[in-house]
Design a protein with these regions (language model features):
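Membrane-proximal intracellular helices of multi-pass ion channels
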Residues: 1-445
């Protein structure tokens, strides 16, 4: 029988990305299981360690164990590093290690880096990675320095560690906090609801981390000359501004009637910023009106911007869907923005991503509701928080059974790796149809 020669198969860059995230999550879970990771020196059950590690790497912030009271300083440090790796991306972090060690980056590694941060080209990718790493560390350091006086006033020298942790958590849009205690767990930033320093610094870190690395580069190179920015940066900044101001006005008039002028404005602004994948909260979310919860679900699904520390289906996806609707109203064949025509394939990708997120959101929420016997609205809120990698909760996540927590783990993972990355990793382009079939039309609407 003749020998068959099998061609050696290599992992694609997209497969490397999704397996890289999975590997870091599993490694983090094993470390968090160790007695040294818990404050009481006990072994943490695997499913709870896995949930925490997934939430950290996927920069979500949903927790089943209070971060401030359950985990030791070692465990909290592990969580912070997992957040940093997840925020920058597994590939970006690994590349940063290569850059710092002075090792050469291969063409395959450069291609993987390009796909990891959705860079338009391979050229200059190492320089961009270096810019991202330096910018991240500088911004997180500045954020921590601003918060140190407040936290040191309340917690003494421990406030330095808390400032660093919360700065990393906010910049990476993770939403983990250390403010819970054994008697009052899962409190987030509610004790700082009227503190302007903490509110403003956390909001700025969330926004800067969520607008994307390429937008940073545009601002760095062109300063505040908006007309010189790339179209993507223009779309991101415009959409981000609208998604902050409009919901803030809504929250201002809809909720927080118990707060006075400036404090009410601060709470409304914070509540508009944090659902876009950050996960911090300064007020009790269970007390919000149904309309406010619905608004937050929409914001959680939209998320941050491409090539950023944030998750969700992304601001550009949402903007392109709206622009497509606008083009239909105007009876235009092309979707345009800022004097440029947008490729039809990009619109198709945006529609695909949006459908994936909405399907995962509804399927996850309904499954949890049926299994747990909880109100559908509450379960949809948790599902949106998971798939949008946000971390906001109505308080039911720690009380869910293991199966429901596994569903949230899957949603967090899929929400972080991204719709297109998952599609390109699973489905080969060999299935791409080479010949074009006859054109036909279907009546819609």
């Amino acid at each position: 029988m003749p020998w068959r020669i099998h061609k050696k198969r290599h992992l694609t860059s997209f497969q490397v990305i999704i397996l890289g995230f999975a590997g870091v999550i599993l490694f983090g879970a094993l470390i968090l299981m160790l007695p040294i990771s818990s404050a009481q020196g006990i072994i943490t059950p695997f499913h709870k360690a896995l949930f925490t590690s997934t939430s950290a790497v996927c920069v979500t912030g949903l927790v089943v164990l209070d971060t401030g009271s359950y985990w030791s300083v070692f465990g909290q440090t592990v969580i912070m590093f997992l957040i940093q790796i997840g925020g920058l991306g597994v590939i970006t972090t690994a590349t940063s290690v290569f850059i710092l060690s002075g090792r050469k980056i291969s063409i395959m590694q450069r291609s993987t880096m390009q796909n990891a941060i959705s860079a338009p080209k391979v050229g200059g990718i190492v320089r961009l990675m270096s810019f991202i790493l330096k910018g991240t560390l500088l911004i997180e350091l500045i954020g921590a320095l601003f918060m140190i006086p407040v936290f040191c006033h309340d917690f003494g020298l421990r406030g330095i560690w808390m400032s660093i942790f919360h700065s990393v958590s906010a910049f990476c849009n993770a939403g983990f906090d250390l403010l819970g205690t054994k008697w009052h767990p899962f409190v987030s930033l509610t004790s700082y609801a009227v503190n302007p320093v903490i509110n403003i610094v956390i909001m700025l870190l969330i926004i800067i981390g969520g607008i994307g690395f390429f937008t940073w580069e545009d601002i760095y190179l062109h300063k505040f000359h908006f007309k010189h920015y790339h179209m993507q940066s223009k779309v991101i900044l415009t959409t981000t501004l609208c998604l902050i101001l409009l919901p803030a006005v809504f929250f201002f008039f809809q909720d927080y009637g118990n707060l006075s002028g400036i404090h009410r404005l601060l709470a409304a602004l914070f509540q508009a910023v944090t659902p876009r994948t950050a996960g911090f909260n300064t007020t009790d979310l269970s007390m919000l009106t149904g309309a406010s919860k619905a608004m937050m679900i929409l914001l959680m699904l939209i998320g941050g911007s491409p090539s950023s520390t944030a998750g969700g289906m992304k601001t550009t996806t949402f903007a392109l869907l709206l622009l497509n609707v606008l083009a239909t109203f105007q009876r235009c064949d092309d979707v345009t923005a800022f004097g440029r025509r947008i490729d039809a394939s990009v619109i198709k990708n945006a529609t695909t991503i949006a459908m994936m997120y909405f399907i995962l959101f509804f399927a996850g929420g309904m499954t949890i509701s049926v299994y747990e016997g909880l109100p559908l609205s509450s379960c949809l809120f948790e599902a949106a928080s998971a798939v949008g990698t946000v971390g906001l909760t109505l308080g039911i996540t720690p009380k869910l059974h293991i199966l429901s927590q596994i569903i949230l783990i899957i949603l967090m993972y899929l929400g972080r790796v991204g719709g297109l990355t998952l599609i390109y990793a699973v489905f080969s382009d060999k299935n791409k149809r080479k010949a074009r079939l006859p054109l036909d039309k279907i009546i819609v609407g």
